[in-house]
C-alpha cells in the first residue's frame, strides 16, 4: 500500500513538472532558444496565451522576441513549439525600448511553430532606443530552416511604433519567411490581415521560401522610405484566393503592390497605391514567370514617379473575367497599363476591360492581346 502511494506521488510530481514546463505566466515572453543537444524537443500550450513582453535572444546579438523557438545547431535536431488555442502578442509598452530588431513570433534554426485556435493576434509597436539604427519591427519571422504552420482561421498583424524621442527611422515587416525551398522556410496560413502606420520602410509579406495562404489583406501608410505589399523571391510560385493591397507613401515613390520572381496565381487581386509606381511586377532574370488572375484584377495608382505600370509579366499575363486599370500619371513621363514581354501574353477578360490612363505618354498595352468588345480606353 505504501509503495503504491509512493508511486502515485512520483507520477503526480512528474505530471506537475511537465505542466509547469509548458505553462506561461500572463504576459511573459516565451523563449525556447537553446542548444538542442542529441534529441528533438517539444513544447505545447493547450490554453489561450497572451503575451505583452519581449526578451533579448541569448544567441543573436540583434534580436528580441515575444515568442521564439530555435537552436544553435545540435546536429540538426529540432525544437517544436505549439499553441492549441488563440495566441495574442501585444507589444505596446512605451517604456520598453530596445536597440534590437523586435519579433512578435520568431522561428529560428531547426524550429517548428504551430499556432491553432480561431485567431492569432499580433501588435508590434515596439520602441527603438537608437533612432539612427535600421532596426525592424516584425510580426512573424521564419528562418531558412524553420517551419511555421498557422491553422488559426484568422491572423491579424498590426505594426507601428517609432524611435524613442523621434518620429523617424524605423522599419516594419509583417511576415518574413527567409527560407530556402527544399531545405526549410515553410510558411502556411489561412486568412492574413496586415496593417501598419510607420515612418520608414514597409513590407507586408517578404518571402524567399515556400509560402501558402488563402486570403490576404494588406493596408499600410508610411511617411517615407520604400513599401511593398508582397515581395516574393521564392521560386515555387504563389497561389492565393483573394488579395487586397492598399498602400500610401506620403514622401517618395518607391511603392510596389506585388513583386514576384515566380508564377503568381490568384482568384482576384485588388491593388490601390497612393504615390506608387508599380501595381504588379512578375519577372525573373532566369525565367519568364506568368501572372494569372482567374477572376478580377483591379489596379488604382496615383503616382508622381517618372514612370508607372499597372501590371507587368515577363511571361503570360492572363486575366479571366474583369480588368480595371486606373493610373493618374499626370506628373510622370511614361504610363503603362499592362505589359507582357512575350507576344502571346493575353487577357481573357475580353468584354470587361476598362483602362483609364492619365499622363503625357500613355501605353495601354504592350505585347498583350485580347482587348476586344466593350474595351474602354481613355
Language model feature labels by segment:
Residues 1-26:
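Gram-negative bacterial Sec-dependent N-terminal signal peptides
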Amino acid at each position: 500500500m505504501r509503495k503504491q502511494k509512493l508511486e502515485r506521488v512520483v507520477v503526480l510530481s512528474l505530471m506537475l513538472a511537465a505542466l509547469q514546463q509548458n505553462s506561461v505566466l500572463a504576459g511573459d515572453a516565451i523563449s525556447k532558444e537553446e542548444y538542442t543537444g542529441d534529441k528533438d524537443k517539444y513544447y505545447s500550450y493547450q490554453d489561450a496565451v497572451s503575451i505583452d513582453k519581449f526578451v533579448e535572444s541569448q544567441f543573436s546579438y540583434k534580436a528580441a522576441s515575444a515568442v521564439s523557438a530555435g537552436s544553435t545547431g545540435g546536429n540538426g535536431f529540432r525544437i517544436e513549439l505549439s499553441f492549441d488555442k488563440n495566441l495574442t502578442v501585444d507589444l505596446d509598452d512605451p517604456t520598453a525600448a530596445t536597440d534590437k530588431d523586435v519579433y512578435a513570433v520568431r522561428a529560428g534554426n531547426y524550429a517548428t511553430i504551430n499556432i491553432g485556435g480561431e485567431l492569432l493576434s499580433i501588435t508590434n509597436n515596439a520602441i527603438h532606443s537608437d533612432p539612427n539604427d535600421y532596426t525592424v519591427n516584425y510580426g512573424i519571422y521564419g528562418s531558412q530552416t524553420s517551419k511555421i504552420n498557422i491553422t488559426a482561421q484568422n491572423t491579424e498583424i498590426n505594426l507601428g511604433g517609432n524611435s524613442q524621442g523621434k518620429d523617424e527611422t524605423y522599419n516594419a515587416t509583417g511576415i518574413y519567411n527567409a527560407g530556402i525551398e527544399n531545405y526549410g522556410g515553410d510558411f502556411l496560413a489561412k486568412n492574413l490581415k496586415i496593417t501598419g502606420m510607420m515612418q520608414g520602410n514597409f513590407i507586408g509579406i517578404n518571402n524567399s521560401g515556400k509560402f501558402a495562404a488563402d486570403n490576404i489583406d494588406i493596408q499600410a501608410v508610411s511617411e517615407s522610405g520604400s513599401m511593398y505589399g508582397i515581395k516574393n523571391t521564392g521560386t515555387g510560385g504563389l497561389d492565393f484566393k483573394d488579395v487586397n493591397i492598399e498602400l500610401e507613401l506620403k514622401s517618395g515613390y518607391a511603392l510596389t503592390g506585388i513583386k514576384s520572381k515566380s508564377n503568381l496565381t490568384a482568384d482576384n487581386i485588388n491593388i490601390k497605391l497612393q504615390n506608387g509606381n508599380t501595381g504588379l511586377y512578375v519577372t525573373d532574370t532566369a525565367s519568364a514567370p506568368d501572372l494569372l488572375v482567374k477572376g478580377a484584377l483591379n489596379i488604382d495608382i496615383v503616382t508622381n514617379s517618372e514612370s508607372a505600370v499597372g501590371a507587368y509579366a515577363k511571361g503570360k499575363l492572363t486575366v479571366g473575367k474583369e480588368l480595371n486599370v486606373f493610373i493618374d500619371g499626370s506628373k510622370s513621363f511614361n504610363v503603362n497599363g499592362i505589359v507582357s514581354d512575350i507576344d502571346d501574353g493575353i487577357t481573357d477578360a475580353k468584354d470587361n476591360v476598362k483602362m483609364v490612363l492619365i499622363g503625357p505618354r500613355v501605353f495601354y498595352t504592350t505585347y498583350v492581346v485580347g482587348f476586344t468588345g466593350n474595351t474602354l480606353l481613355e
